[in-house]
Regions:
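Sec/Tat signal peptide C-region and signal peptidase I cleavage site
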Residues: 17-23
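Extracytoplasmic "Venus flytrap"
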Residues: 26-49, 53, 59-73, 83, ...
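Short, solvent-exposed amphipathic alpha-helices that sit
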Residues: 38-52, 134-138, 162-182, 196, ...
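Short beta-strand elements in bilobed, periplasmic/extracellular small-molecule ligand-binding domains
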Residues: 52-64, 151-154, 177-192
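Hydrophobic alpha-helical segments within soluble ligand-binding/sensing domains
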Residues: 71, 126-152, 166, 194-198, ...
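Hydrophobic alpha-helical
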Residues: 85-104, 171, 190-252
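Flexible loop/hinge segments that line or gate small-molecule binding clefts
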Residues: 93-133, 140-144, 151, 246-259
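Hinge/cleft segment of the Venus flytrap/periplasmic-binding protein
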Residues: 159-163, 181, 276-328
Length: 328
């Protein structure tokens, strides 16, 4: 009998030792759409944060199409899974609010990052950079190579994308005083779809024969526009610029379709989003003036809308694109 008890105890210990160690905190990183290099890079940072924290599992998820309706389905599934936090880059600032409010009512911490949710649908928002600075930067990237000024157009993501719309408004506001000889002739939307973005870029070139630059504040649109300029033999005539991943865009800096682009580090952005979400799960407070941890990225101080910015955008050109294309 004693031997049986010893064997039973030994077996129980063996089972406990063999059992997998489950993460205590589950944070969902919800992106606009899967298969987007920017968000894949953000996920790398998110997984880095999870590994650093040790007791966190990151669930990387999102729809296949960049629509609010598809994101709502993802949110509802995460509520059913009873995740601890949702960190979302929103396809629409308002349409997601009811689903995210439901999540918060269930005790799930909710933050938005990259592309924001209306304040009533989240606890805080992490901007990749300061909105006015991004708007000024994307215009400056075109203006720097147009000493005599000229016509430019913007190829954005979806018409409801919170971040792109804010950057475009900031860019427009900067034109009269900072770039008076730059004429913005059109803003079109490619919905972060490469086929539609290609068609919109072709449409701009056809509609505006004096077009000097296409500015795309989206990593999908900027690649599509640069490919169109390359294919139509317009290198040196139409400059493509905007926000781009160096790894995806290097060929267009190399061939001259673009002189320069900018971006923040999406790896850092995903990392910071997970760190902030985890801070809330652990009892951190999201309120104006509060300071929360972004790990190796420092601290985020919230403004009166419970928003904060991570870092300034960084410019990539022939001098550094090779180096950074190997990183992200």
């Amino acid at each position: 009998m004693k031997l049986l008890k010893i064997l039973a105890a030994t077996t129980a210990v063996a089972v406990l030792l063999a059992a997998p160690a489950y993460a205590q905190t589950r944070i969902a990183l919800v992106v606009k759409s899967l298969g987007n290099g920017f968000f894949d890079a953000a996920n790398k940072g998110a997984q880095e944060a999870a590994a650093e924290l040790g007791d966190v599992e990151v669930i990387y998820t999102g729809p296949t199409a960049a629509t609010a309706e598809a994101q709502i389905e993802v949110i509802n599934a995460l509520i059913a899974q009873q995740v601890d936090a949702i960190a979302i880059s929103a396809n629409d600032p308002d349409a997601l609010v009811p689903a995210l409010q439901k999540a918060m009512e269930r005790g799930i911490k909710v933050i938005s990052w990259d592309s924001g949710v209306a304040p009533e649908g989240r606890q805080l928002h992490l901007n990749p950079s300061e909105t006015n600075l991004i708007g000024e930067t994307i215009i400056k990237l075109a203006a720097d190579f147009l000493p005599d000024g000229g016509d430019v157009a913007i190829l954005s993501a979806s018409s409801t994308a919170t971040n792109q719309n804010a950057w475009i408004e900031a860019a427009k506001a900067a034109l009269p005083t900072m770039f008076p000889n730059i004429n913005l002739v059109a803003v079109v939307y490619g919905d972060d779809d490469s086929v539609k973005s290609t068609d919109e870029a072709k449409g701009l070139i056809a509609s505006y024969p004096d077009l000097k630059a296409i500015i795309a504040p989206t990593t999908v649109g900027v690649v599509a526009a640069a490919q169109v300029v390359t294919d139509m033999d317009l290198i040196g005539k139409v400059n493509v610029t905007g926000l781009a991943l160096p790894s995806e865009f290097k060929q267009f800096i190399d061939n001259g379709a673009s002189q320069a682009v900018a971006l923040w580090n999406p790896i850092d952005l995903g990392y910071s989003a997970v760190m902030l979400a985890n801070d809330l799960v652990e009892g951190g407070t999201a309120e104006p003036g509060a300071t929360l941890s972004m790990g190796r990225m420092g601290e985020l101080t919230l403004d009166d809308t419970n928003s904060g910015a991570m870092a300034a955008p960084f410019t990539f050109d022939k001098s550094n694109i090779e180096e950074f294309s190997k990183i992200y």
